Amino acid sequence: MATVEERVWTMGDYIEESPRVARENLARADELTAPLIACCDGGVPTRIRLVASGSSYNACQCALPFMESCLPDVQIRVVTPHRFAYYEPAVAAGELVAVVTQSGLSTNALEALDAIRAQDRRAICLTGNVASDAREHADVVVDWGVGVELVGYVTKGVTTLALFLMMFAAKLGAHEDRLGELSGAIDAADAVRAATYGFFERNEKALLSMAVSYCVAPFGARGVALEGALKIGETVHVPSPAYEVEEFIHGPNLQLTPGYTLFFFDAGDAAGERTRLVYRAAREVSDAAFLVTTDASFAGDPHVLVAPELPSWELASLAYLPFVQLVAHLASSALGSSKQHPLLKRFKAIAAAKTESFVNYDGDE
């Protein structure tokens, strides 16, 4: 039997694993969150800063609305390691700063940890790999419970990180009653995962013809829009920005043509009606405009994936994540588009994003 390292794993394998692992992690909420809660020294910080990049940054954004609702008196910010290290490294009294890196090998995250240590502050790292290089740069290493994920285009890690941060906020804010909402969101995400295959099949020609892709959402679904833009850009290799729904119609929409692909994410919050209106407007220009929503009135529309009703709008990004993950995976697999240009090897030799300990299992270089 092949070992984990010998088997060729795909994004799809980890997307399929995610609901099970998420449910297992929710059952382990006390165990998983205890180390980070211990870093709060018996109280609630006045400020929390999550320092993360790439998909980890997006996972933090997915968690942010729910975290803020559980910790209304805490200022919670998500910043990149670059911004932290170069522009705002000072750690204030009463502030919890946690640096996030799934691999534990991201050079910018390690630099941020070093910047914290240089102030004689406690360097806290959230990671999926406690045996990584990060342990040499951090004072506290917290495993958020992703397990093994060998594919570089991470999916299970995003889902489990968002869930971990939500569990942490619920526990820290004494809102354990809201853990049931997280269970409902996991169930909704599993339903979205299952429904995305049919959605992709219905819209296969359009989704295999992406030239420029926009992901558009209100604040309530900003995290999933950011992650969708990143995953499509990483794997399908087309320009793929993300916009807030109202910012989208103040300039970025002016370049639209029928050749553009657009994904709209309706969080089901107060901005939902506006989001759906802008989606309908986009369809006047492009037939490749799509919507993910919980609004049952769209049932039967082949361009819309109707998700189950959510326990709260703050969970929209977590529930919708499998949609963007699978669209990127199915499209890039069919197209064989994730292979990188050979000149990128020269780029990485000059400006590396990972330490020398990093092993690329994707075969995409």
Spans of model-derived segments:
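Phosphate-moiety recognition in structured ligand-binding domains
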Residues: 2-12, 24, 138, 271-273, ...
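Active-site phosphate/pyrophosphate-binding segments
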Residues: 7-45, 140-142, 148-261, 271, ...
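Conserved phosphate/anionic-ligand binding catalytic regions in large, soluble enzymes, centered on
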Residues: 8-11, 58, 62-63, 225-227, ...
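Glycine-rich phosphate-binding loops that contact phosphosugars or nucleotide phosphates
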Residues: 32-34, 41-187, 218, 253, ...
